Curated annotation (Swiss-Prot):
Keywords: Coiled coil. This is Coiled-coil domain-containing protein 42 like-2. InterPro entries: CFAP_domain-containing, DUF4200. The keyword Coiled coil applies. The keyword Cell inner membrane does not apply. Residues 34-133, 175-231 form a coiled coil. Belongs to the CFAP73 family.
Length: 314
């Protein structure tokens, strides 16, 4: 708690420090008397201040001591609370561990009880099994006696167990042979089924191949007919080509003769090759166009020229 020193002194000395108006009877006091009076008042005030200061110091020390005691008590209280909280937590942890251990012990006890019941039931079953085996042993004792009599009559075996082992060996061999025979029969059946399946597939393939052969033969006949048609057409084309070649030769020969006749009569000088039929035809066409134009001009002028004879070709 914070202590206000100013408020404390103000409250303590408010009455003593107030300036009092002098009474009228003081008007007759001498200055020396007044000075002594003021000094006396100052001494009283200083004594009062000293007393109040000592009281304040004592109260302040008491308050500090009280504060220290309160802080110490607070620390002790905090420590006690911490220890109490720790105690509660440890106690709760111990309680949880105890509960967990009790639960585990209950589970273990239940498990042991179930195990005991199971062992008891198993023991009961074993006792029943033992009784059954004893009954079977008593029932099969006649076979033991029979085997003992057989052993006495043979010199091959010395004990009954040897005879039983020999019998078990023969039975195992028989079982192996029977198993092998069964496997061979199954293998033979599978091979027979595979053979039948293969024969069926082969017959189907042969039938399919025969159908394909028939189709291919028909296709071959059609191809041969088409080939014969194309051969006939090719012969016709060759004959037509020969005729066209012969006709083309005649045309080229006639063109050359006509070109040479025109060139000779019109005295044309050209460097056209005898093989260039197209150039010859172009030259002949130009000459015919020129002659036609000249003829038209002469006809307009009233003079009809004598048309030169143009050689004809077959």
């Amino acid at each position: 708690m914070e202590f206000d020193l100013g408020e404390y002194f103000r409250a303590a000395f408010e009455d003593k420090l107030l300036v009092k108006m002098p009474d009228r009877e003081d008007d007759f006091l001498t200055p020396a008397t007044r000075l002594l009076e003021k000094r006396r008042e100052m001494v009283e005030v200083e004594q009062a201040l000293s007393t109040q200061k000592e009281e304040f110091q004592m109260k302040s020390e008491s308050l500090q001591q009280r504060r220290a005691e309160l802080e110490l008590k607070e620390e002790k209280l905090k420590d006690s609370l911490f220890k109490f909280d720790k105690f509660l937590k440890e106690n709760d942890s111990k309680r949880k561990r105890a509960l967990h251990k009790a639960a585990e012990e209950r589970q273990l006890a239940a498990h042991k009880e179930r195990e005991a019941l199971r062992l008891q039931a198993e023991n009961t079953q074993l006792m029943q099994r033992k009784g059954t085996l004893l009954e079977r042993q008593e029932k099969n004792s006649k076979y033991q006696q029979y085997l003992q009599r057989v052993l006495e009559r043979t010199d091959e075996f010395q004990e009954v167990q040897e005879m039983i082992d020999r019998f078990n060996t023969l039975m195992a061999t028989q079982n192996k042979l029977l198993k092998r025979d069964l496997e061979n029969q199954e293998l033979a059946e599978r091979e027979k089924a595979r053979l039948l399946h293969y024969q069926e597939e082969t017959r189907s393939q042969i039938l399919e191949l025969n159908n394909q052969i028939a189709q291919l033969q028909g296709e071959l006949e059609r191809v041969r007919a088409v080939a014969f048609q194309w051969e006939s057409r090719w012969a016709q084309i060759q004959n037509t080509a020969a005729e066209n070649t012969l006709r083309l030769g005649r045309i080229r020969m006639s063109t050359l003769n006509l070109f040479q006749t025109i060139s000779k009569q019109m005295r044309l000088k050209t460097e056209i090759s005898v093989e260039d039929t197209e150039a010859q035809l172009e030259k002949i066409q130009i000459c015919f166009e020129d002659l036609s134009a000249i003829y038209k001009d002469l006809k307009k002028a009233g003079t009809t020229p004598q048309t030169p004879a143009v050689p004809t070709t077959n």
